[in-house]
């Protein structure tokens, strides 16, 4: 009798072990089977080391990459291929955030019931939100300079342009050892760069909401070209003379913003970098942007002043700054970006700034264009912008231009960075104009 009991217990233990193992396998199968299916050793979906199923289109239906043949067939135009290389990707997965890498499971068409089987055997189509013609315009506008252009619809979240340079031809990719630095990075998504004066839009938001309105209205600063804090010189490009809050932003006066940063304080500046989404990573159909990083030393007024100007240890992700531009355009809330044209609905961000703050920033950004950049340089565009000239050790400044246009049919925010170049409005501004003119006027 005892033997039977022992055998029953042993069988029960074995059954529990079997059930536990089976449960663990089912759990992992449900959770991870999509990644198992798209491993390189799966000959059903890979051929000669590259994906052998699925096609990638842009938002207008232009075929960007066809994986279904013996080799990957890309769009015919070389410039278009290079303008969209980091967005579309290549057969070898050099760009981890590209469609060929990030949307591999969609291209394969995997699901739990049928696996990778499809009636056609050709996988699925993926339609990106980018417009390849806009990307080509951005690529040509950047020329041979390193940089990036990002444009998105601040009402729907659709990213219509994300172009990075230097780039490569996915039909004939270079050896990774010989490629220029940044070639295989989508800088719009994965980059972190010193922002320079475009960060003053964050400092301005903090000033509006943290400094009493009566004091901010009376704010005045006499710029002589050099402002000293604790024996350290903070320089401007020129002596701006007497400036108020609005004038300080229009003239991008470092001295004035150093003083504003001191009044706001390190803790509040840090809080607003977070509130404005600059330390946020957004889920864009499964692709995540890099987080920006910022330091605001509590007991170091000099470093806090530099940080509020957009220097010191400020490192900005362009995608997150673009979303903040959307918040200013949208009365304080923005829309999470999307990389797929087929992605329906919209996901709003949390409120970044008050609606009244957004309205005031819009007014100030419009004043920037009128007073400093020249509306005639952006003909036909109702543009709101801030330039930036970020000092980078060992090279010329990085030129920035960020903002949005107010147009019922074309509600787009933009960000441009031209590395190792010069002044923001003089270098990055014309790039933004060329891209926006093409979007609005097709020319």
Feature map (PLM): residue ranges:
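Beta-lactam-recognizing serine transpeptidase/beta-lactamase-like catalytic domain environment
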Residues: 60, 155-196, 202-424, 441-443
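Periplasmic/cell-envelope proteins involved in peptidoglycan metabolism and beta-lactam response
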Residues: 1-176, 183, 192, 267-275, ...
């Amino acid at each position: 009798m005892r033997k039977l009991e022992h055998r029953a217990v042993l069988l029960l233990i074995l059954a529990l072990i079997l059930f536990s193992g089976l449960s663990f396998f089912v759990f992992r199968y449900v959770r991870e089977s999509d990644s198992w299916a798209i491993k390189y050793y799966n000959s059903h979906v890979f051929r000669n080391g590259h994906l052998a199923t699925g096609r990638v289109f842009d938002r207008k239906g232009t075929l960007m990459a066809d994986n279904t043949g013996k080799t990957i067939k890309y769009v015919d135009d070389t410039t278009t291929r290079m303008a969209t290389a980091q967005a579309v990707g290549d057969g070898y997965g050099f760009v981890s955030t590209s469609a060929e890498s990030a949307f591999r499971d969609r291209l394969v068409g995997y699901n739990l019931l049928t696996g990778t089987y499809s009636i056609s055997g050709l996988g699925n189509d993926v339609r990106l939100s980018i417009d390849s013609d806009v990307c080509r315009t951005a690529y040509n506008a950047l020329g041979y300079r390193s940089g990036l252009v990002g444009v998105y619809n601040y009402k729907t979240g659709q990213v219509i342009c994300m172009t990075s340079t230097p780039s490569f031809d996915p039909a004939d990719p270079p050896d990774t050892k010989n490629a220029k630095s940044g070639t295989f990075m989508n800088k719009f998504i994965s980059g972190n760069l010193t922002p320079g004066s475009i960060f003053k839009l964050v400092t301005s938001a903090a000033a509006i909401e943290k400094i009493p309105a009566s004091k901010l209205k009376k704010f005045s600063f006499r710029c002589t070209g050099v402002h000293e804090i604790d024996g350290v010189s903070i320089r401007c490009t020129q002596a701006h003379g007497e400036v108020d809050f609005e004038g300080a932003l229009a003239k991008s006066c470092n001295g004035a913003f150093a003083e504003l940063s001191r009044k706001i304080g390190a803790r509040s500046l840090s809080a607003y970098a977070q509130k404005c989404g600059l330390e946020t990573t957004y889920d864009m159909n499964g692709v995540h942007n890099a987080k920006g990083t910022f330091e605001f030393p509590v007991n170091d007024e000099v470093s806090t002043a530099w940080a509020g100007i957009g220097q010191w240890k400020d490192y900005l992700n362009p995608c997150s700054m673009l979303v903040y531009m959307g918040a200013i355009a949208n009365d304080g809330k923005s829309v999470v970006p999307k990389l797929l044209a087929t992605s329906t609905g919209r996901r709003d961000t949390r409120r970044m700034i008050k609606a009244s703050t957004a309205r005031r920033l819009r007014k100030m950004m419009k004043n920037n264009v009128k007073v400093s950049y020249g509306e005639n340089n952006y003909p036909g565009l109702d543009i709101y912008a801030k330039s930036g000239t970020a000092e980078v050790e060992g090279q010329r400044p990085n030129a920035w231009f960020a903002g949005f246009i107010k147009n019922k049919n074309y509600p787009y925010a933009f960000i441009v960075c031209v590395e190792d170049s010069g002044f923001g409005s003089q270098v990055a501004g014309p790039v933004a104009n060329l891209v926006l003119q093409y979007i609005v006027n097709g020319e």
